[in-house]
Amino acid sequence: MANEILINLLSEYEQKRYKAERDLEKRKTELYNKFPRLQEIESELNSAAINKAKSILSGGPKSLDDLTSKVNKLKKEKEQILIKNNISKDFLEPNYECKLCKDTGYIQSGTSASILCPCLKQKILDFSYNKSNISNLNKENFECFNPNIFSDKIEPEKYNINISPRQNILAIKDKCIDFINNFENPDYHNLLFTGNTGLGKTFISNCIANELIKNGKNVFYQTAPVLLESVIDNKFNKYKTSSQDNFYKTVLETDLLIIDDLGTECLNSMKLSELFTILNTRLLNLNNHITKTIISTNLNINNIFKNYEERIGSRIAGFYDIYYFFGDDLRFRKK
């Protein structure tokens, strides 16, 4: 998938570069029709460049000095014509979107090797963000994480636990960063976020998504109701489109799948079967690469066993690290 993204973007860059160079040729034609001497100078400069290269190879210092002097005079004459007619010198240069890489996507590093231009890196990130189906990654990331919105009061009688919501969310954050840093390690489990609505489960999921996308991973987010409906539509639609085929492939093969709001879907046997297939395929690494899943839900693990098939509950209990979110609803606190 990462290679496909790069290939698609480089194709876009090639088109941009071609357009910039084609537009330059149009401007040159217009300008040379008005000022024929500019075209003559351009031709003489090209000839001088060829002769200069020949002179360097033949080792003739005098002829090289003469050619250098001639080139400087021609450039000076060209500059004077442009200034006299209020024409910017950039008018005869390609109008690339990125001046740094000239719309190639690559720049030279300190060595002879080429590296990705910052503009292409950003394009890859933007493309990956859009592909993830998460709309607010610019706001929901660890840079925006504020533990102070969580209460620091320890209330075991209320939450049945001897730490505060703030201590809890900080511990969860540390575990999630560990998950990111060890994403390729098959011994690291998937994640189940459980707790009431408005406690930061989706926010933390998006923070993880953001970091993994920056690391070049493919991420796909969807709520459980939409995910399961779409998968069933895909499977039983005789006239499905290529985009529907790609959707199912993405669900099974994306590096990180985020299933939000598990437990809010209307369940039936087909949805249970498809949910098991998705979870099991990704658990067994049947795609020949490491795939991880994050599930967020209002259900605790006991309710998951109760509401879903035994085989789904056992997969989650056995292969997911479970993190309990508790505290006051942050949606009201923010207001």
Regions found by a protein language model. Give the residues of each.
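Walker A/P-loop nucleotide-binding motif
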Residues: 188-204
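Conserved alpha-helical scaffold flanking the Walker A/P-loop in AAA+ ATPase domains
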Residues: 177-183, 230, 234-257, 273-284, ...
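Short, charge/polar-rich alpha-helical segments
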Residues: 1-12, 16-42
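Short glycine-rich substrate-engagement loop in P-loop NTPases that contacts/grips substrate
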Residues: 154-172, 188, 213, 217-253
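Interdomain "pre-motor" coupling segment immediately N-terminal to P-loop NTPase/helicase cores
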Residues: 83-140
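Pre-Walker A (pre-P-loop) alpha-helix and adjacent loop at the N terminus of AAA/AAA+ ATPase modules
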Residues: 138-190
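Loop/turn-to-beta-strand initiation segments
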Residues: 189, 217-218, 253-256, 285-295
